Amino acid sequence: MNTDDKKMIGVIGGMGPHAGIDLVQKIFNQTKAASDQDHLPIAMLSIPHSISDRTEFLLGKSDVNPASAISEVIGTLSKIGACIIGMPCNTAHATPIFNEIIERIPKEVKLVHMINEVSKFIKNKYPSIENVGI
C-alpha cells in the first residue's frame, strides 16, 4: 500500500447534525466506482456537544469561539489520515471562526473553504453571471 492509499477525506459533523451525513452521501453519489473498494476513503467525526454555537459567538452572546473545538476535531481526523477536510456549515466559515481554525490546524491539512470554492465554481462554470443570490 503506498502513502496515497492512506489519504482520506475528512468531514466535520455535528454543525447541523445532518449536514455531515449529507456531504458524505453527496461524495459517495458523485464517485465513479464499480465496487466498494473503488470508493474514496472518508471519515466523518460528529461531536455536536463539543462545538459551541457559531451564531451565538458571532453575535457576541458567547465568548467561546467554536474554532477551538472544530480544530480539535480536525486534529483527530488528521491523525487517522484525513488530508483534506470538509466543513458543511456556512456559519463556521465566518472570518472570526475560520481564520482561527486555520491558525490552529496542522499545516499539512487542507480545510476547504466551502464559500470560496462555490464562488470559484460559479466563476468558472458561468462566467457571464455577475450576481448570485443566497
Regions found by a protein language model. Give the residues of each.
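Helix-enriched interaction subdomains in cytosolic or periplasmic regions
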Residues: 73-110
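A short, well-structured juxtamembrane/interface segment
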Residues: 71-73, 117-118
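Short, acidic/small-residue loops that bind anionic groups at enzyme active sites
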Residues: 35-37, 101-123
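Short, well-ordered alpha-helical microsegments
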Residues: 20, 94-98, 119-120
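N-terminal glycine-rich anion-binding loop in soluble enzyme alpha/beta folds
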Residues: 1-68
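Conserved beta-strand elements of the Class I
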Residues: 10, 130-134
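Glycine-rich phosphate/diphosphate-binding loops that line cofactor/substrate pockets in enzymes
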Residues: 2-5, 76-80, 120-130
